[in-house]
Amino acid sequence: MDQSVRRYGARFTGRTAVVTGAASGIGAATAERLAREEAAVVLVDIADERGQAVVDGITKDGGHARYVHADVAAEDDWARIVTAAHDYGPVDVLISNAYTVDVAPAHELSPESWQRQLAVNLTASFLGFKAVLPDLRAHRGAVALTSSVHAHAGIPGHPAYAAAKGALLSLCGQLAVEYGPEVRVNAVLPGPILTGAWDGVTPAERERSIAQTAVRRFGTPEEVAAAIAFLCADEASYITGSRLVVDGGWSVVKDSV
């Protein structure tokens, strides 16, 4: 068993969680973490084979999980997600983690790409929250939105991605104010996390990113998942509208240069 799970115990026993973008990376690690802490987890993605593989791993370890193929930017698909979750029970936890990115400078980015990136990276969080809000209100649920350190610091070739991640922080605060005290809403801001997004990145570029952190290494999806689990657990009952940075000190190193 993961030592952090052993230390904190089963904080989500009897609860149902929905995790989007759950077929890989931070989403998969979060689904696995919540399942190890005894949540029943609905994994949402469009990468069916990978998503089902994560579910199979969870159930093999004795957890409860199922996979739903859905476009999180389509409101009708959220009705199916909620129906699937209700096979376990009302939704207590929503992790809005799905993302997409097209790398191009603003002057080369098509309006269609801009709209799709905002739809998945921003609008999907609104649609998901709206869909599960009745459950969250009734059961004093928790929401975690996956933003990014690039909500605050620009990154070449990512205008729509950065814009959406910045807007997520405003959405986080707005939802926390509007729906407290029944619902808590927080955001995590990962920095350089070693996921499939780094596939194809040159060793030199990787080393440059590592050098920009205070801990001189990449973070892992499991470390972000631990932060998300904390924000959604009862220990964080007095935390809402917050922005938890998980970046190995990347932000402070960048600010000191």
Sequence positions of predicted segments:
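Short C-terminal tail/terminal secondary-structure segment
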Residues: D2-G9, A153, A229, T240-V257
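Canonical Rossmann dinucleotide-binding motif of NAD(H)/NADP(H)-dependent dehydrogenases/reductases
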Residues: Y8-V42
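Active-site helix of classical SDR
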Residues: F129, A164, C172
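Residue(s) in the substrate-gating loop at a strand-loop-helix junction
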Residues: S148
